[in-house]
Amino acid sequence: MAHEILIAETEAFLKNVAPETRTAIISAITGGKSACKSAAKLIKNEHLPLMSGEATTMHIVMRCLYPEIKPWKKASDMLNKATSSLKKSEGRDIRKQMKAAGDFLGVESMMKMRAFRDDQIMEMVEEVYDHPDDYTPDIRIGTITAWLRCKNKKSERYRSNVSESGRTALKIHEVRKASTAMNEIAGITGLGEEALSLQRQTESLAILCNHTFGSNIMRPHLEKAIKGVEGRVGEMGRMAMKWLVVIICFSITSQPASACNLKTCLKLFNNTDAVTVHCFNENQGYMLTLASLGLGIITMLYLLVKIIIELVNGFVLGRWERWCGDIKTTIMPEIDSMEKDIALSRERLDLGEDAPDETDNSPIPFSNDGIFEI
């Protein structure tokens, strides 16, 4: 039963794919372990005309069916990012509930009754993908079947609701406003080139959004690019604050210990009644300087500790390579796959309704114990 539902949901998920590709994937899934492994290898090597999201989804389905298929780094990275905001306690609870669910119906009812968020559903998928041997075939198949059903229902809802594209446009508008604000910060902190680069990327995103308005094909790329720009805005804001702290500390500590006398102070800074300036006496000047030196020392110690932590993370824990990969895929989100998806979507649009439906609608062969037969 679960196998048949899985095939039906897979066909529904692939209904925008070329008929021959859809037939090949369904035949591989129903054709046993060797056929599925061959298809997974073709998907991994990008030999099938699938978009990046379709390819990772199909690889997840095939590995959950047959754990002998090796995991794909691209799919693992996608799952890791989708569950990065999930708390560890939530992950433990989800794993316990999964093992108690039993089968597809149990998994689906668990998702519905608990009203799982997207990241919680993706945690379930990540578990059966990363650790398939820890779960029974019923749990694995039930999880990916319920996940595909959720994706298909969302897809139908998005097709009839253009407000999703409106939300995307609003997000890009917010990013554009943020990039304009970064120009103001750049004037203080010397981040002018970064701000201009960010603004150019935001304009490109706006153009891409206008071209794909109302379409779901490019939505994952748009969302990923928007998150990348938002991340850069946040990072530049943090850099600006650090620069300002350092500049303030050094500018204060560079002042002489004795403050200017009262006559000089009034002459330079108190020319009108509208301006009031507090002029420090010598003792107050010493205290201010000591406080500034203390603040500067604390700031330098903080920066030194941060540098040591970053060095430990990079050389000892080896996190720099992962961070570089995250930056590459988040700030500049998969340009090659984006271009490939754009070209593939144009081919599908050109093909239109004239594409013959060559899907094999013959009954799917199952043995008595529910295993696929060739």
Swiss-Prot record:
Pfam families: CM1 (PF03026), CM2 (PF03021)
Consequence of changing residue 272 to A: Loss of carbohydrate modification
Transmembrane segment boundaries: 239-259, 289-309
Keywords: Disulfide bond, Glycoprotein, Host cell membrane, Host endoplasmic reticulum, Host membrane, Ion channel, Ion transport, Lipoprotein, Membrane, Palmitate, Phosphoprotein, Signal-anchor, Transmembrane, Transmembrane helix, Transport, Viral ion channel, Viral matrix protein, Virion
Gene Ontology CC annotations of this record: host cell endoplasmic reticulum membrane; host cell plasma membrane; membrane; viral capsid; virion membrane
Cytoplasmic side: 1-238, 310-374
Site feature location: Cleavage: 259-260
Single Gene Ontology BP annotation: monoatomic ion transmembrane transport
Sites of S-palmitoyl cysteine lipidation: 324
Annotated effect of mutating residue 337 to A: 93% loss of phosphorylation. Complete loss of phosphorylation
Subunit structure comment from the entry: Homodimer; disulfide-linked. Homotetramer; disulfide-linked.
Listed name of the protein: Polyprotein p42
